[in-house]
């Protein structure tokens, strides 16, 4: 299989597979000078002060009911995971801000068609869930060549 065919195959599989950093390497993580353990121990109002303005403003207004429901699901999943049971967390809340207590979980985020599994690592903190489950896919053009444009589609046949 040529390299171009391999690239096209990767595009079909989903190109947004993020590089997953193993939990053993999470010790090097710092968010605004704080380690993950420090972030987990911070009260919510102190954590909010560390976020960028858009996320800070959103959380200061309070959580929406669907976000509260998602946090309850996450806490329940963590309790069940401690007992050895595996729970799938599915959500439509693409505008939920990733909090430190979500780290280490896989949350299935709806992209309009299917649920995309998103493994939450410390580097996702402060971002929105929807950023990691794209709603559109990369355009894969057909003949007469890779990355064909409209003008080059109408090439005269020999």
UniProtKB/Swiss-Prot annotation:
GO annotation, cellular component aspect: cytosolic small ribosomal subunit
Organism domain of life: Archaea
Ranges in coiled-coil conformation: none
Keyword field contains Ribosomal protein: yes
Record has Disulfide bond as a keyword: no
GO molecular function, one term: rRNA binding
Transmembrane segments: none
PROSITE patterns: RIBOSOMAL_S19
Keywords: Ribonucleoprotein, Ribosomal protein, RNA-binding, rRNA-binding
A biological process term (GO) from this entry: translation
InterPro entries (UniProt xref): Ribosomal_uS19, Ribosomal_uS19_CS, Ribosomal_uS19_euk/arc, Ribosomal_uS19_SF
Family classification: Belongs to the universal ribosomal protein uS19 family.
Function per UniProt: Protein S19 forms a complex with S13 that binds strongly to the 16S ribosomal RNA.
Protein name: Small ribosomal subunit protein uS19
Native source organism of the sequence: Pyrobaculum neutrophilum (strain DSM 2338 / JCM 9278 / NBRC 100436 / V24Sta)
């Amino acid at each position: 299989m040529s390299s171009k065919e391999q690239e096209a195959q990767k595009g079909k599989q989903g190109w947004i597979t993020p590089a997953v950093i193993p939990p053993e390497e999470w010790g090097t993580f710092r968010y605004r000078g704080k380690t993950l353990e420090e972030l987990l121990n911070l009260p919510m109002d102190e954590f909010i002060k560390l976020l960028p303005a858009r996320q800070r403003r959103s959380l200061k207004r309070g959580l929406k009911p669907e976000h509260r429901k998602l946090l309850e699901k996450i806490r329940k999943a963590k309790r069940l995971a401690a007992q050895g049971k595996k729970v799938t967390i599915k959500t439509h809340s693409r505008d939920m801000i990733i909090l430190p207590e979500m780290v280490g979980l896989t949350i299935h985020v709806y992209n309009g068609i299917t649920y995309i599994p998103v493994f939450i690592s410390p580097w996702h903190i402060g971002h929105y869930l929807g950023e990691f489950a794209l709603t559109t896919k990369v355009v894969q053009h057909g003949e007469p060549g890779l990355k064909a444009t409209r003008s080059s589609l109408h090439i005269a046949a020999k």
